[in-house]
From Swiss-Prot:
Protein's job: Exhibits a very high intrinsic GTPase hydrolysis rate. Involved in the addition of a carboxymethylaminomethyl (cmnm) group at the wobble position (U34) of certain tRNAs, forming tRNA-cmnm(5)s(2)U34.
Primary localization: cytoplasm
Keywords: Cytoplasm, GTP-binding, Hydrolase, Magnesium, Metal-binding, Nucleotide-binding, Potassium, tRNA processing
Binding site for Mg(2+): 230, 251
Cofactor: binding details: Binds 1 potassium ion per subunit.
Record-given protein name: tRNA modification GTPase MnmE
Cofactor(s) needed for function: K(+)
Binding site for GTP: 226-231, 245-251, 270-273
Top EC class for this record: hydrolase
GO cellular component labels: cytosol
Any Gene Ontology biological process: tRNA wobble uridine modification
Sequence positions that bind K(+): 226, 245, 247, 250
Protein family per UniProt: Belongs to the TRAFAC class TrmE-Era-EngA-EngB-Septin-like GTPase superfamily. TrmE GTPase family.
Amino acid sequence: MNSSKTTICALASSVGKGGIGIVRVSGPLCKVIAKKMLGFIPKPRYAYYGLFFDQESTEIDKGIALFFPKPYSFTGEDVLEFQGHGGMIGMRLLLESAISMGAKLAESGEFSKRSFLNGKMDLVQAEAISDMINANSKRASKSAFRSLSGDFSNQINGLTKSIIELRVFVEATIDFSDEEIDFLQFDQVKCKIKDIKQTIETILKSATQGIILREGLNVAIAGKPNAGKSSLLNALTQESSAIVTDIAGTTRDVLKETIHVNGVPLSIIDTAGLRNSHDKIEKEGIKRANFEIEHADVVLMVFDAQDDKPDLSILPKNINDQSLLLIKNKVDLTSGAIKREVINDIVQLSVSAKYSEGIKLLRKELSNISGLEDLSEGVVLARRRHIIALEASLVSIGNAIMQLEIGAIELMAEDLRFAGQFMGSITGEFSSDDLLDEIFSSFCIGK
């Protein structure tokens, strides 16, 4: 247990006015603070209703107090909670009283960090707390809860155990190569390591889906001026987010709105019309438009249905055709119908943004093109660092397979060691202080 010598305190409820406000205290001074602010030490895990006092024994509030002795608490340390009236001044008085008695104001995520360091949860579960707080859809919240409950950690720990067990067998073969011991045969080892590789690939696919669920996708709307880009944004968001006129070049800056498709957040980005311009302001808007288009996950190339075909030459050169979706807009001005077709391996949708016709088709296509339809209900939220670690582990396993093929058993054992370390970094078994600081600094103060 990594018990800290300092005692921390923070507001654990939302900042602002509310029916109830909570101040949380954790550390070795909890009992001292309880005696001064309550007049007694509460019985563990029992709720007590009474007066709260400041450092001068003046009554400052009345509410419920809870005490959780170490190690049976969230942080693994003594924890004291004051639940009072949710006014900003009242909460500040409680915090000031705790600080005057030796506590210090907690840093962002410090309660969760202490919980991790004291072995109450692993790094994935700690991150899941933040993900639950910041979840922007029901699906994301449920997935974060699965991570908090240990689903993702169990997958990683099981895989890490398999890698370690295989490495033990391989190293034993090295240590006792001159002995007549019946170790795993070549084909059995190869089968086991390929099973590990397949499992990593499966988890990596699920984690990649979890990234989409957690972070969403950026969808840039591109096209010439007056093609109906802003109308398309308004139709997708079902709001008048963008100004729509018949004057070309109305949109001069980037406008972003968020929608949800299949429980996944999509950031829809309306951009300035792409054309050659001598107007200084419009040129800056086009520059920003190109930046958003280049960095988008999906590009909606909007063109007028009265044109024969879209002018793809106006798009930045380094976008991926697979992320491109052609939107043939204003079909209400032609004899064309709302439909989906594939032209030169690129999906094209005929829509009328003005009358919101074909928008359901577009939302479904956004789900398809982004792979969101394949999201399983059991997916857990993941972070970029998880993907990096899984990919690195997969490379090491691939190297280990190659070393096995040529009989380089010692090098194979080393690659298995690397793979295990990469996997262990996900749950925090192997983590640097800098990584921990980066992760927990994004948390709320009271978590």
